[in-house]
């Protein structure tokens, strides 16, 4: 059941993306989570993927979700499952091979850096402190921005609740006609303010990626003198570090966005509940309005308490990743597994290439079809 759910969700993500813009990152995340959770059973899962029954279910899913399928999504449907099957098969085969390659790479790096172990550890420690200094303002900035946006959300929404209560107190006969516009505006304002909230908080992820690049580049320069004949191997490890750190930034962005959407989902039903009582008695409407104000304050406060600490948690995660690199390169590293981040990076690169190729082919197909269509629509000369 887990396998079927994951593969169906993979197809669904791709299909819903095809309606607007295909998000290769979403598809790659589904595939990587699938591979990670299956673990040692990945080979068996690949065999299941190839069964015709599952392919038929995917075909049914495309038909159910899309109805009339356009040329692009039909092409995607045909290519997605074989691509996923082949890629997971390669992941299974490459995992142990890559693990051994990374082990040897780290051994060579450690051997080369061993005479300078103290200096290398010091340089990485300096980099950690610089990273903490760079991220400090981000933590405070995110916390401030969350508070600002939450207060703005409450300021924008409360007046609508107050106006509806005022109309109710005035005992206006036609409550439905008087209150309904405010209830509609309240619901629209929820959508508008949640989108603004997401728009103000998610750009932090892009700023963080720039800081990550800067910090990793400084670390590379500081370690370069100690790794002159193994520079390529050091660069490879730093690429893995940057990938993992940027992944944290993307996860932060996704968590903020998901919490904002969750806030909207919790507020909208209360607004709809007011609508539902407009044709009922005054007492029911009054009760739903009281619930609306109290629910608004409660849910907004829960959102604030949940999102505020994200900056600090994110900072700690980034610092820990640099510390993990220090351990990998140190003389007492032990059996540190570092190959999975490289495997995931390779998967994401391949998924991006796959979708870029599909989009390019679709674009070329549309370009070729346009002149033929224009020719067919041209008036006949008499």
Curated annotation (Swiss-Prot):
Residues 1-20 form the signal peptide. The keyword Secreted applies. One of its GO terms (molecular function) is phosphatidylcholine-sterol O-acyltransferase activator activity. Sequence repeats lie at residues 33-54, 60-81, 82-103, 115-136, 137-158, 159-180, 181-202, 203-224, 225-246, 247-268, 269-286, 287-308, 309-330. Gene3D superfamilies: Apolipoprotein. InterPro entries: ApoA_E, Apolipoprotein_A1/A4/E. The keyword Flavoprotein does not apply. One of its GO terms (cellular component) is low-density lipoprotein particle. Secreted in plasma. Disulfide bonds: none annotated. It comes from the Eukaryota. May have a role in chylomicrons and VLDL secretion and catabolism. Required for efficient activation of lipoprotein lipase by ApoC-II; potent activator of LCAT. Apoa-IV is a major component of HDL and chylomicrons. Nine of the thirteen 22-amino acid tandem repeats (each 22-mer is actually a tandem array of two, A and B, related 11-mers) occurring in this sequence are predicted to be highly alpha-helical, and many of these helices are amphipathic. They may therefore serve as lipid-binding domains with lecithin:cholesterol acyltransferase (LCAT) activating abilities. This is Apolipoprotein A-IV. The gene is APOA4.
